[in-house]
Every structure is written in structure tokens, then in C-alpha cells.
Regions:
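N-terminal intrinsically disordered/low-complexity leader segments
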Residues: 1-16
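Hydrophobic/aromatic-rich alpha-helical bundle segments in the mid-to-C-terminal region
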Residues: 5, 150-198, 209
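Generic hydrophobic, amphipathic alpha-helix propensity
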Residues: 14-26, 42, 52, 67-71, ...
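Helix-turn-helix
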Residues: 20, 28-62, 66
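Amphipathic alpha-helical linker/stalk segments
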Residues: 31, 65-98
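Short helix-capping/turn signature of helix-turn-helix
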Residues: 57, 118-123
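Amphipathic alpha-helical packing segments from all-alpha helical-bundle domains
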Residues: 100-116, 125-152, 162-166, 197-204
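Secondary-structure edge/capping motif, primarily at the C-terminal ends of alpha-helices
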Residues: 113-120, 183
Length: 209
């Protein structure tokens, strides 16, 4: 797993202040439709000083990564994904539930996540935050799931678990939502059905159900 660290030490702050900062950052990015919001703007909206943000999160990468992780605590989607992928075994039905949970969560995080993806080409802080969720969390979860399915004999013949996980990840990535739902006008329900169908046919045995 790739880990991004800050060289400077951070200072603990109250949970209330931390939440106010992270939710202010998310709200401002939604309003501005860009991820490069200044710390002064975030501080003003959260009712804190810039120094508080700097001391609590270290740098912009630390702030953005904490922000996207905080969003994951707003619903039980991530907890449910983790529970399924950390089980001792998995069936095709477990995998379907896993995909359903992610496809339900994707529209919630999309508005800011896609801004981070666009900025990631030239913005190391945005790249760090995006990788933390899309690779270190989502892709890693798919690798655990496909590993469990492989142990149960459910993968298509000749398909290795990690390669299968990367294929699934690409099919349900937020970039696909941008291309098909935003770009081509697909309805969310159409997107969900197509992703489930394509993933099923791509990685599972014909008798998987």
C-alpha cells in the first residue's frame, strides 16, 4: 500500500473542530468545482485560523486525504464494504452485494472525487488524496474480494485474482461514471445494470449464478 506522510508533526485538535474543517473543505470544493481551495477560505468557513489547519493536517495533502476519509464516515457504505471483503470466505452473491454497495456510494463521492482526479495530473496533493481512496481503499478491497472468490473456485478459468480485481476496478471507477452518466447521459440505473453485467461476465465462472 502506498503511504503518504507529512514530514512535520501535527497537533491534535478537537473532533468538533476537525469535522468543521473537513466539511468546510468539501463544501467549498463543491461550490467552486475545483480542489485548489485556499486554506484561508477553508479556515474562514470553518471558523478557525489558518494556523489551526496547518498544525492539524500538516500540509495540503494531509488535509485533502483527511477530507476524503472523513466523507467515508458519513454513511455506512465503507463499513459494509470492509465487512464483506475482510470475511473468511466470499460467494458470488457476496461479491454482488459488494458491487451494489460501491455503485450506490459512487454518486455520493463523485462530485469532489472527479475534481481530484482531474487535478491529480499536476497536483501531488490531489493525487495523494485520490490514491488513498481509489487505490489504497477501493482497489485493495477488490483484490481481497477476488482473492476470496478465487479460493472458492468462482473465478473464470485462467484469470488471476489481482488482474481480475484491476479489471473490475476499471469497470466501476469514477471515470466510467463520468464517461457514461455525465458524458453520454446514461441513467444511474442503466450504469448500475451494465456494470454488474459486465463485471459478472468478465471475471466469474459461467455457473456463478
Amino acid at each position: 500500500m502506498k503511504v503518504y506522510t507529512c514530514k512535520m508533526k501535527t497537533t491534535p485538535i478537537s473532533e468538533e473542530t476537525r469535522t468543521a474543517i473537513l466539511e468546510a473543505a468539501w463544501a467549498l470544493m463543491l461550490e467552486a468545482k475545483k480542489p485548489d481551495i485556499g486554506q484561508a477560505e477553508i479556515a474562514a468557513k470553518a471558523g478557525v485560523s489558518r494556523q489551526t489547519i496547518y498544525m492539524a493536517f500538516g500540509n495540503r495533502a494531509g488535509l485533502l486525504t483527511a477530507m476524503v476519509r472523513h466523507v467515508d464516515t458519513g454513511t455506512d457504505h465503507v463499513q459494509r464494504l470492509s465487512a464483506i471483503s475482510h470475511a473468511a470466505a466470499a460467494t458470488p452473491e457476496d461479491f454482488r452485494r459488494y458491487l451494489d454497495i460501491w455503485l450506490d456510494y459512487l454518486p455520493r463521492i463523485y462530485p469532489v472525487a472527479i475534481l481530484l482526479e482531474a487535478a491529480a495530473l499536476t497536483d501531488a496533493a490531489a493525487q495523494a488524496a485520490l490514491d488513498d481512496r481509489m487505490k489504497d481503499a477501493l482497489l485493495a478491497g477488490f483484490k481481497r474480494m477476488l482473492g476470496l472468490l478465487a479460493k472458492g473456485g468462482h473465478l473464470a478459468p485462467g484469470l488471476k485474482p489481482d488482474a481480475a480485481a484491476e479489471l473490475v476496478w476499471s469497470l466501476v471507477h469514477l471515470a466510467m461514471w463520468r464517461l457514461l452518466v455525465v458524458g453520454c447521459g446514461w441513467r444511474p440505473a442503466e450504469f448500475r445494470r451494465s456494470r454488474l453485467d459486465r463485471v459478472w461476465k468478465a471475471v466469474l465462472k459461467d455457473d456463478a449464478g
